[in-house]
Amino acid sequence: MANISSDELGIQPIGKLLVKQSVPAAIGILVMSLNVLIDSVFVGKWIGSIAIAAISVVLPITFFIAALGMSIGVGGSSIISRALGAADREKALKTFGNQITLTFVMTISMVILGLIYVNDLIPIFGAKGSIFEPAKIYYIIILYGVPFLAYTMMGNNVMRAEGKPKFAMNAMIIPSVANLFMDYLLIYVFDMGMAGAAWATTTAYFMSFSYVLYFFLSKNSELKINWGHLGFNIPILKEIGSLGFVTLARQAVISFTYLLMNNILFNLGGEAMIAVYAIIGRILMFALFPVFGITQGFLPIAGFNYGAEKYDRVKETIYTAIKYASVLGSIVFLGLLIFPEALTSLFLSNRADLPAEDKLVNTFVLEHTPNAIRWVFAATPIIALQLIGAAYFQAIGKAIPALLLTLTRQGFFFIPLILILPNYFGELGIWLSFPIADVLATIVTGLYLRKEIKATLV
């Protein structure tokens, strides 16, 4: 789990290197996912299941704004990995400076717009009925912390591009631990309700940003923050935009999917159905952390070796990553198949003073969520090919294939399915949409990746 120099990405054995890169990323994602999971448990236990639903409808908006930082980070880091692989340090430094400037301009602009149109935005994403007021409270406070989260996401990708996965892991662990402490203090001790949950998360975002800033000002980073490299370089911006647009488009589609899902679910079962989906979303983030960790670890290795024209190592990286992630995905599936009831119960409060509406929602959630979990995660053993395949094209700087493969699952398959299947199968149609979309997207990605490997990695 030690940090390595960027040159070692082209030297060390692939299996060992993938573990070194993936384990810190997976631990960071695990801690962050545990943070979201336990945060939701705090909210569910001490505020109520309506509050979980309220947070769920807000997250797609705030995460989309934060994803601007992620997209700039991923797009720029692909350039940085290839530049370091080609020994072009100046281009790497210029790219980093452009990332810093672009993240600031984009996120601040979006936050201002988000605050101005708050009353119009959150109802569109499903904040209706008794969900609206708690969602608005949470949303406004969280927006103040979103720029810090965006910078953390951007910096985290640059750390991995440098071959510093341990520091990237720390950047995710620090805010997660801080958020848990602040949740306990503000929700349980001071009983601040939704405002407490929001301020806890916002404070954690700021702490994460502080650590990332420290890293890039210290001797640990190869890419120092330099005023001379800040600003906009049009060719670099175009490349960041073309590659980062893949990540942004993915988050945009995810946010749009949440919009559709929350509205369809509200029409089917009101606030209770949104609460079911909110719990599944929390479990999804937590359960797939090892697969996402391998995907993150895969990116800098593939990008560096492609830039260094070591194509045999690139192929080995692809196959090894898919194999490791598939095994871990199968283990995750078995766990969710066996213990869905226990996982659902974690989020539900048994407080005697719980409002009657929350008690009714709890009963509904406990009855409907376990079966939904089994369907939603049914294709987990095969999603590794889908994720690694799309990530590969992003790593090597091929923006169009990366974009199309990224949109395949959500945009081309899942959204049409959730618009069609509920008309015939009701609630079950929603949950069936998940594994069907996964299977179809995996087939398409596998065929395209196979064609690309035969054509270019020779």
Label each region the model flagged:
Residues 52-112, 149-168, 276-340, 383-402:
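Small-residue-rich hydrophobic transmembrane alpha-helices
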Residues 23, 27, 58-61, 101-105, ...:
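Hydrophobic residues within alpha-helical transmembrane segments
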Residues 1-22, 80-145, 189-244, 302-379, ...:
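Short alpha-helical transmembrane segments in multi-pass integral membrane proteins
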Residues 37, 46-49, 83-86, 161-162, ...:
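Helix-loop interface residues and adjacent transmembrane-helix termini in multi-pass membrane transporters
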